[in-house]
Amino acid sequence: MGEYGIAPGQRVAVIWDSSSPVEALKGLVDAVQASVGADSRVSVENINQLCQSAHRESSFDVILSGVVPGSTAQHSAEVLAEIARILKPGGRVLLKEPVVTESENNSQIKTAAKLPAALTLSGLVEVKGLQKEPLTAEEAQSVREHLGYQGNDLLIVQIEGRKPNFEVGSSSQLKLSFAKKTSPSGKPSVDPATAKLWTLSASDMNDEEMDLLDSDELLDSEDLKKPDPASLRAPSCKEKGKKKACKNCTCGLAEELEQEKKSSQPKSACGNCYLGDAFRCASCPYLGDACLQAWREDPAEREPAA
C-alpha cells in the first residue's frame, strides 16, 4: 500500500475502535495483508485492549491506528506510549484522529496543536501532520454518538511519527583510547615578522639609542629609609594589657620581650645559692631547687650538682 508506505515483509499492526465499520476494517486488513505478503502476519488490535495484549517490545515495523474509514478513535497517553513501546527502532506509526480547532472545557477531544505534542511526549520523533480536512457527515455523526461532542468545529487529522533508532535504556560501548597522541613531526611555522616583534636581542640591550627604564629611579628617598620597628607592629601589639608576641613575629616585639625576660632574672646576693637550701637565705628564689655545680648568671646554663 503506497498510501501508507508499507513494504513487503514488514510486520504491521492495525488498531481499531468501536466506531470502526466492520466492512471497512476487513477491507483495510485485506489490503495491508496483500502488501506485506503471505509470509508476514498482520495483527489487528482493539484500541481499548492494546495495553493488555502484552506484545513484545519492538514487534512492528508499521502501526496504523484510527485509519479505518469512518473511525473516530481517540488516542490516550497510555495508548501512544504502548504504540511507541511495540514499534521497532525506526518504525513508523500513522494515525487519524478527530480534533477541534479551539480548546473547550470538559472536552476529551484534543486540539490540532496538542495531538503532535502528545506523540512527541510518548517518545516518537519526526512527528508531522500529513492531512487535515473536515469530517464527512458520517464521521460527524459517529463523533456525536461515540464521543458525545455536539460542536461543528471538528477536523480529521492524519499524522505520522517515527520511533528513534534506539531502544529507551539501551547502552552502547564507547571506544576510548588512552594512548598518548603523537605530536606532529614538524613544528608549526612562525611568521618571521611576528618573531622579530617579540624578540629582544643582546645587541638591542647595549644599544645607546634604546631608552630603558632604570628601576632605581622608581624609588624616592622615603622609600630608602629604614622603617621604625614600632611602626611595623601589628595593631594587636599596641593593645593594653599583657604584651604577647605573634607567632613568627617580625616587628621586634619577640626580641624585646626576650630581653626583658633575661633582665628580670633574679641574681644571687650572697653567692651561696648553688650550695643548697642549707646555705640559702629565707627569701632566696631558688629555695627547693637542687644544688648547683657552679653559679652562673644565666639560669638556663645552671646544672644540678652531681
From Swiss-Prot:
Protein's name in the database: Anamorsin
State the residue spans of region: Linker: 173-224
Q: List the ranges annotated as motif Cx2C motif 1.
A: 270-273
Purpose:
Component of the cytosolic iron-sulfur (Fe-S) protein assembly (CIA) machinery required for the maturation of extramitochondrial Fe-S proteins. Part of an electron transfer chain functioning in an early step of cytosolic Fe-S biogenesis, facilitating the de novo assembly of a [4Fe-4S] cluster on the scaffold complex NUBP1-NUBP2. Electrons are transferred to CIAPIN1 from NADPH via the FAD- and FMN-containing protein NDOR1.
Q: What domain comment accompanies this record? A: The twin Cx2C motifs are involved in the recognition by the mitochondrial CHCHD4/MIA40-GFER/ERV1 disulfide relay system. The formation of 2 disulfide bonds in the Cx2C motifs through dithiol/disulfide exchange reactions effectively traps the protein in the mitochondrial intermembrane space.
Which positions in this protein are listed as binding [4Fe-4S] cluster?
A: C270, C273, C281, C284
Respond yes or no to whether keyword Cell wall biogenesis/degradation is given for this record: no
Where are the annotated segments for Fe-S binding site B?
270-284
Which parts of the sequence are annotated with region: Fe-S binding site A?
237-251
Under the cellular component aspect of Gene Ontology, which terms does the record hold? cytoplasm; mitochondrial intermembrane space; nucleus
Q: Which family does it belong to?
A: Belongs to the anamorsin family.
* Record gene name: CIAPIN1
In its UniProt entry, the species of origin is given as Gallus gallus (Chicken)
Which parts of the sequence are annotated with region: N-terminal SAM-like domain? 6-172
HAMAP family listed in its UniProt record: Anamorsin
